[in-house]
Amino acid sequence: MSGRSRLFEVKQRVREVNIERKQHAPGQILSGTSYFFSELSQNPTLAVDFPIAPPQMAHYMECSTRIYSIYMKYVAPEDIVVYSIDEVFMDITDYLPASGMTAREFARKIILDVMDTTGITATAGIGTNLFLCKVAMDIVAKHLPADEYGVRIAFLDEMTFRQKLWAHQPLTDFWRIGHGYARKLAENGLFTMGDIARCSVKNEDMLYRLFGKNAELLIDHAWGFEPCTVPEIKAYKPETNSISSGQVLHCPYETDKAKLVLKEMADQLALDLVNKKIVTDQIVLTVGYDIENLSDPSRRSAYHGSIETDRYGRSIPKQAHGTQNLDDYTSSSHRIMNAAVDLFDRLIDPTLLIRRLYIVANHIIPEDTALQKKDRFTPVSYTHLRAHETSLH
């Protein structure tokens, strides 16, 4: 299995393996379970098992914050781009001369500091641009043997990328190539980055017909190029601003239970608005349903709505998605929560099990800007609103 398999994929594969083990077990009987390879190898009557750790996002966020503070001992915040809870990009170009270290030595020093401070090992990709850094980490470093301290570091430049990874498969291992892109490329006989690069020389127009303006970035990446830099990312100002919150529920939820989670998410979203001194005039909600709605025969027979296929090829009820405009700009927890619940009640099928919730506060602007829109938002009403919000929290 791949190193980033989904839980349902692991369960499915383990079920298949245990069917095979049962067929070859004495008397076709499995007497117990184990998740230790040595025990499973020696005892054919044991079924494969594995522990499932419940997610602890608050703990993960705390660890991520601690690790980021370690990064700042070596690199200034303006040279760090936080990509996810466990990944960052760093531009260390100007730090190497003063440190007297190579890029690999510099990265290793940071990684060892993280391990000494938190006990967490890290992997690094070094490259001549952002794309090569990401690919060096995702594809090359993660498959290298760790040193005595658990450190894995890989380097790529444009030429070594072409030498090592032009023939690599699957394409979905590469940053920014999803299953949809890979499927469309395969339909046109392109299965590797090398294929894409060669196609860009011989038949570039085909790539633009398939992907529009996004073909430009795809072609750049196929050759190991990346035009975007860390300073450009830090300077970027999006035309449309929003903040969001999403949850994948750890098990299928009935409507009432999912609504309670949504209320908590809406309340937290409003608190984020207040803390950041911004306001919104639109709430967007997306509700994703669980596969059990169609895999359970009794539920399947009762459902007559639209069906879509997820990225793993599974059939699920079509997700619910909608927008609720607010009367004016606000950061009121009460108003945002009510809007989210009204939207939820209007959109969802109450007979279906829910697995994902995603809420967005759209069109966000600073409080001061909202105050200037006197035709929509008066200073008096806003002062009253902020006082009410403060009392709620």
Regions found by a protein language model. Give the residues of each.
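Short, internal active-site loops enriched in acidic
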Residues: 93-95, 128-133, 287-294, 362-368
